[in-house]
Amino acid sequence: ELLAKEKVDVIFGCWTSVSRKSALPVLEELNGLLFYPVQYEGEESSKNVFYTGAAPNQQAIPAVDYLIKEMGATRWVLAGTDYVYPRTTNKILAAYLKSKGVKDEDIMINYTPFGHSDWQGIVSDIKKFGSAGKKTAVVSTINGDANIPFYKELGNQGISAEDIPVVAFSVGEEELSGFDAAPLVGHLAAWNYFQSVESDENDEFIEGWQRYIGDDERVTNDPMEATYIGFKMWAKAVEKAGTTDVDEVEQAMIGIAVPNLTGSIAVMNANHHLSKPVLIGEIQEDGQFEVVWETPDTVIGDAWSDFLPSSKNLMSDWTAPLRCGNFDVTTGKCSG
């Protein structure tokens, strides 16, 4: 309807990967343009989508590296909601961990439905799994409102962040807003932006958002920054192309650079993914995050994982002459 009836030039949106994948065939058929602002599982590349959220190598992989190097984790719980993003991300993470020498018996994988609230049995299993004498960490792709009862049950069973740290990919300022964050203090999240980051751009953005919404307690979060970056880039690309035509703007987007909110520069690459910093934040009592680690430079998002046999030889480059989203470097063939 937005494309065929309203004739919109661009869409900024979709939340879950399910919604994005549902919209994708329509976008490609009607030649629409989508800026997708949420972290996702990778393994996808479309001419009609710019992925301004994190790919796995801009969130999941660095988070695991942090837990290995800084916290000495050797045993892993991959806990997620049962849909495409957690399942694909955990498939990548399991392969990555095995490439690091982690054995199958040191990886526990668990999936729960959306909105899951009874965590007693699962947390008990995690506690037992973590009692084998090896440093255990939880990598969480649990989505939405299921997170709060999960963390509460960790506390109920006496599991602290020092005992078994949890790093989450779907818990941010908005999810913690209005909740008692005490059970979550010390646990971690991996994003490309936190509201607590100190920069002039961030101060201006927060002030403008709170003024617009009429609430000086309203929080900001990573998908908001990704949307902000995408919109500024699209505006620059339209100015560069001199038109809102999708094909012209899509090509003009490549190489566009704008300031992000963390004090560095976001660049749109030929694979329709951003260069972004990766930050690890520790949850505080007020629901904000203290940044405890960040990459020294921005990281280019990778559409295809290096750790899955099905995609390790694939690359995405939407510039001429290649103009391909899944080019196999071993066969020299493009599949789309």
What kind of region is each of these model predictions?
Residues 2-15, 35-37, 75-80, 133-144, ...:
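Periplasmic-binding protein-like
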Residues 3-8, 24-32, 65-73, 94-102, ...:
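Sec-exported extracytoplasmic/periplasmic mature domains
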Residues 153-228, 238-244, 295-331:
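Extracellular/periplasmic periplasmic-binding protein-like sensory domains
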Residues 257-336:
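Solvent-exposed, acidic/polar segments of extracytosolic/periplasmic ligand-binding ectodomains
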Residues 5-10, 29-34, 46-48, 71-75, ...:
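Loop/turn elements at helix/coil->beta-strand transitions in domains of secreted/extracellular proteins
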Residues 1-43, 52, 111-120:
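Beta-alpha junction/loop-to-helix N-cap segments that form part of ligand/metal-binding clefts
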Residues 13-14, 78-81, 216-225, 245-249, ...:
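Surface-exposed patches in mature extracellular/periplasmic domains of secreted proteins
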Residues 41-42, 48-157, 196-204, 266:
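Extracellular/periplasmic Venus flytrap/periplasmic-binding protein
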